Amino acid sequence: MSLIHSTAIVDPKAQLDTSVEVGAYSVIGPHVKIDAGSKIGPHVVVEGHTTIGRDNTIFQFASIGAAPQDKKYAGEPTQLSIGDRNTIREFVTINLGTTQDANITRLGSDNWIMAYVHIAHDCQLGDNIILANNATLAGHVHLEDWVFLGGFTSVHQFCRIGAHAMTAFTAAVSQDIPPFVTAAGNRAVPAGINSEGLKRRGFSSEQIMAIKRGYKIIYRSNLPLEEAKAALLAEENKSSDAAPYLRQLRTFIETSPRGIIR
């Protein structure tokens, strides 16, 4: 029995593993590659130079690999890469990259992408990310591992959001959010650290307390940012168990091109 519905249109040049399921009325373009165990629901369009890994589930009416919503795009063969075990719900749109960046949009593995999410051109997403309904990423946004974006969160182009960071419902993000930090509001401002998420991921009480001290140095000490970075380094040198996380926080701030939320 074929796993491709009789009404689906799969280009003969597309490369689909024999275990891939394709639902009714879906369209798969000629430059698409889909690995074993992935399920493409009904009424899905997968186009462009798109590679989809193993055991992904894509629900109805998603648009995967369409041209960037960028007027500079002139049809170049840019790419979209999707890893393994992702869930992509209804009406999600994920666009190809552009030649103005790295030529590729990337989605890692084990991500949960809820309905109506938009992931624009050249976005780079890590692993174990949750994007709640209607979250919108503008072009060139980078999300590190374990990020959680609340529903209707919007992220300005070129912003970075650090590992384990979280946004509240309707947050409007216009600057970088450091790792572990929770942000809320329009414009988004810091609102503590993502303690509950860290507990669920096995961080110890001592590590969470050290991260909280790092947060207070940045956001509650009234120190200029350069002095806060020096104080973070001193805290890092005192906290052997949490030093990698404090270093992660400090390095993110030092390399932030847009500046962090304050």
UniProtKB/Swiss-Prot annotation:
Coiled coil segments of this chain: none
The record's listing under InterPro entries reads: Acetyltransf_C, Acetyltransf_C_sf, Hexapep, Lipid_A_LpxA, Trimer_LpxA-like_sf
Gene Ontology biological-process entries? lipid A biosynthetic process
Q: Which CDD domains match?
A: LbH_UDP-GlcNAc_AT
Pathway per its UniProt entry is: Glycolipid biosynthesis; lipid IV(A) biosynthesis; lipid IV(A) from (3R)-3-hydroxytetradecanoyl-[acyl-carrier-protein] and UDP-N-acetyl-alpha-D-glucosamine: step 1/6
Taxonomically, the superkingdom here is Bacteria
Known catalysed reaction(s)?
a (3R)-hydroxyacyl-[ACP] + UDP-N-acetyl-alpha-D-glucosamine = a UDP-3-O-[(3R)-3-hydroxyacyl]-N-acetyl-alpha-D-glucosamine + holo-[ACP]
Q: Does the keyword Lipid metabolism apply?
A: yes
**UniProt keyword annotation of Cell membrane present:** no
| Signal peptide location | none
Gene3D superfamilies tied to this protein: Hexapeptide repeat proteins (2.160.10.10), Udp N-acetylglucosamine O-acyltransferase, C-terminal domain (1.20.1180.10)
Q: Name one GO molecular function term.
A: acyl-[acyl-carrier-protein]-UDP-N-acetylglucosamine O-acyltransferase activity
- Give, as one word, the top-level EC class: transferase
- Documented EC number(s): 2.3.1.129
Q: Where in the cell is it found?
A: Cytoplasm
Question: Which UniProt keyword terms apply here?
Answer: Acyltransferase, Cytoplasm, Lipid A biosynthesis, Lipid biosynthesis, Lipid metabolism, Repeat, Transferase
**Which Gene Ontology cellular-component terms appear in the entry?**
cytoplasm; membrane
- Entry's family note: Belongs to the transferase hexapeptide repeat family. LpxA subfamily.
Its assembly, as annotated, is: Homotrimer.
Which function does this protein serve? Involved in the biosynthesis of lipid A, a phosphorylated glycolipid that anchors the lipopolysaccharide to the outer membrane of the cell.
What name does this protein carry?
Acyl-[acyl-carrier-protein]--UDP-N-acetylglucosamine O-acyltransferase
Q: Give the lineage.
A: Bacteria, Pseudomonadati, Pseudomonadota, Betaproteobacteria, Burkholderiales
Q: Which gene encodes it?
A: lpxA
